[in-house]
Amino acid sequence: MKILVDENMPYAETLFSQLGEVILKPGRSLTADDLVDIDALMIRSVTKVNAALISKANKLKFVGTATAGMDHVDQALLKEKGIYFTAAPGCNKVGVAEYVFSVMMVLAQQQGFSVFEQTVGIIGAGQVGSYLQQCLQGIGIKVLINDPFKQEEGDEREFTSLDRLLQEADVITLHTPITRDGKYPTHHLINEEILNSLRADQILINAARGPVVDNQALKRRLQQADGFMAALDVFEFEPEVDMELLPLLAFATPHVAGYGLEGKARGTTMIFNSYCEFIGNELRAHASDLLPTAPVPKVVLDRKWDEATLHTLTQLVYDVRRDDAQFRREIGAPGAFDLMRKEYWDRREYSAVTLVGSAQCRLKPLAKLGFQVEVSQ
């Protein structure tokens, strides 16, 4: 059995080698020839699975993507060819939410505002958007959500129209897939008209898919230099990056918002377990068994936490400035975008840290944000 695996998928070689011969290749540059005699293909979002890629896949029976998003895979084609497909929904939701929160926290420090006085507008209430909503509301931040699909499906949450959200939110964060057809297409959802309507004190964050925002229109909006800010983890034509847009961004990173070690481990184990089930193998893997201890596994608090404490705790785990600085420093080199993703550091999630404190420390909201908490006597 031959299993072709994206070389950037952590823990994959160790896990899948239990099932057959593992062949590692860079996901973005896979060709049809690479799939000759391949039984299973394990990818990430940089691999476009289409008719051209599988044209020589004479043995392919299984495709798994270790990502929540699935828009890079022609699922109808795979179904037509009798090829089983699976994804890892929700695997990266924690990492993306913590990326967004880091952007908010750092900008709050830099610009002198309180995150607790901001209204956050979440566009897209799927796995990531819903988790982010839960975290922010858990610590007392006002949230507006927009998702016409969820609303029409009968989701009981209180939804907000896109127009109202764009008017009332101080922070607008995008968590939609990329679609070009249908009732609510998201390609260039944030277009020139919308960008020009945004206030100077608003912040736009895109950690979803690059083409959800018209990058040329965003560049023109930021060139007005009126105080409006944007942070991009995804770019419209990545791995190509508009070098005129880059210096205008508050933060820029190479599509790594969901690249926390826990999220990547979850994605890999989810498709590994699906493949084991597909081939009738009883092996199963658990992400928690693969993870090392965090560099700072425990923090003791001696008083009730406040916003300054929150800055310290969250930045102890993840500070977006680290990735932003590397991105600006290295993006000019050939192949830098994918190399930074391939060599991404072992970023952890808040859950890797246990906060210890008495009942007076009121740790429960921090547990809702994702930290482990332990109430001392």
Swiss-Prot record:
Keyword set, alphabetical order = Cytoplasm, NAD, Oxidoreductase, Pyridoxine biosynthesis
GO molecular function annotations of the record: 4-phosphoerythronate dehydrogenase activity; NAD binding; protein dimerization activity
As its record notes, the protein acts as a catalyst of: 4-phospho-D-erythronate + NAD(+) = (R)-3-hydroxy-2-oxo-4-phosphooxybutanoate + NADH + H(+)
Q: In which residues is NAD(+) bound? A: Q127, V128, D147, T176, D233, G258
In this record, what's one Pfam family?
Answer: DUF3410
Keyword Oxidoreductase annotated: yes
Chain residues that bind substrate = S45, T67, Y259
Q: Which InterPro entries match?
A: D-iso_2-hydroxyacid_DH_PdxB, D-isomer_2_OHA_DH_cat_dom, D-isomer_DH_CS, D-isomer_DH_NAD-bd, Erythronate-4-P_DHase, Erythronate-4-P_DHase_dimer, NAD(P)-bd_dom_sf, PdxB_dimer_sf
Catalytic activity, EC: 1.1.1.290
Subcellular localization(s) per the UniProt record:
Cytoplasm
Secretion signal span: none
Query: Main localisation, per the record?
Result: cytoplasm
- Pathway stated in the Swiss-Prot or TrEMBL entry: Cofactor biosynthesis; pyridoxine 5'-phosphate biosynthesis; pyridoxine 5'-phosphate from D-erythrose 4-phosphate: step 2/5
What are the catalytic residues? Answer: R209, E238, H255
One biological process GO term for this chain?
Answer: pyridoxine biosynthetic process
Q: Which GO terms describe its cellular component?
A: cytoplasm
Subunit notes for this chain? Homodimer.
Q: What does this protein do?
A: Catalyzes the oxidation of erythronate-4-phosphate to 3-hydroxy-2-oxo-4-phosphonooxybutanoate.
Q: Which family does it belong to?
A: Belongs to the D-isomer specific 2-hydroxyacid dehydrogenase family. PdxB subfamily.
The protein depicted here goes by the name Erythronate-4-phosphate dehydrogenase
Q: Could you read off the lineage of the organism from its UniProt record? A: Bacteria, Pseudomonadati, Pseudomonadota, Gammaproteobacteria, Vibrionales
